[in-house]
């Protein structure tokens, strides 16, 4: 949007996590990072209301290394512009119900592309591509190894069905975020990582991406959406 002259900023709901010691619990006693209550809901509502009314807000920053909100905030000034709110619960009406309807455009972003071999059989599921994205992002930016991400993955998929697909019919637009080349990127990264507690799942994932030629991440354009998962070239 910026390249088209539209003033824009991204507001990630991940920055609104309540933090270590305050997360709701799953039935097995583990922290539940996926439910909407894992976010500071009143603070999300306040920031969105401020943006809708004035175009300006001071939003939190979450430190994934300490698993706590950072002491500093981020000043977002998008007066006469667009704020892209991204996150698992961005469609949840509990966050946006107090906003003017004409202030919100819901875009459902998901992977739609499938990959098949010469015999027509599916080589890899879209959820495997999403898992590879998340493993790479968590490893590079959130201080988590592959074991942590794979162990959490069944709960993530359950949360997707419960919290995203439930509100999919609220979408004004559907955006396919697939990149035909990205399977080669994940082959490049997944081949570097190991998992001990989830070695079998990691081996299965690696075997699926082994069908594709690795692509060096340096070849990905700096403005590509894939940089969300792999970072800038110099990171």
Language-model features, listed with the residues they occupy:
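Short loop/turn elements that form and flank the Walker-type P-loop nucleotide-binding site
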Residues: 77-79, 101-102
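Conserved nucleotide-sensing/catalytic segment adjacent to the nucleotide-binding pocket
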Residues: 9-11, 18-68, 82
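Conserved NTP phosphate-binding and transfer environment spanning the P-loop NTPase/kinase superfamily
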Residues: 93-235
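Post-Walker A helix-loop "phosphate-sensing" segment adjacent to the P-loop in P-loop NTPases
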Residues: 1-10
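Short beta->alpha connector loops
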Residues: 88-91
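A short acidic-Thr-Gly-centered motif at the start of a beta-strand
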Residues: 2, 74-78
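Short gly/ser/thr-rich secondary-structure transition/capping motifs
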Residues: 63-71, 155-158
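Structural recognition of the conserved hydrophobic beta-strand(s) that form the central parallel beta-sheet
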Residues: 82-86, 107-108
């Amino acid at each position: 949007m910026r390249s088209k002259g539209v003033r824009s900023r991204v507001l990630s709901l991940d920055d609104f996590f309540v933090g270590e010691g305050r997360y709701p619990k799953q039935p097995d006693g583990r922290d539940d990072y996926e439910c909407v209550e894992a976010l500071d809901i009143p603070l999300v509502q306040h920031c969105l209301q401020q943006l809708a009314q004035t175009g300006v807000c001071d939003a939190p920053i979450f430190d994934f290394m300490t698993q706590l909100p950072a002491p500093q905030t981020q000043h977002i000034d998008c007066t006469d512009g667009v704020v892209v709110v991204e996150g698992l619960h961005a469609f949840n009406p509990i966050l946006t119900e107090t906003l003017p309807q004409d202030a919100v455009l819901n875009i459902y972003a998901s992977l739609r592309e499938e990959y098949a071999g010469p015999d027509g059989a599916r080589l890899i599921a879209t959820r495997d591509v999403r898992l590879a994205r998340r493993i790479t992002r968590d490893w590079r930016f959130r201080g988590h190894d592959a074991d942590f991400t794979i162990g959490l993955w069944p709960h993530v998929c359950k949360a997707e069905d419960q919290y995203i697909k439930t509100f999919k019919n609220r979408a004004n637009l559907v955006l396919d975020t697939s990149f035909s080349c990205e399977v080669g990127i994940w082959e490049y990264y997944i081949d570097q990582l190991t998992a001990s507690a989830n070695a079998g799942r990691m081996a299965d994932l690696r075997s699926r991406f082994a069908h594709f030629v690795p692509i060096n991440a340096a070849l990905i354009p700096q403005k590509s959406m894939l940089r969300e998962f792999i970072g800038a070239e110099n990171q």
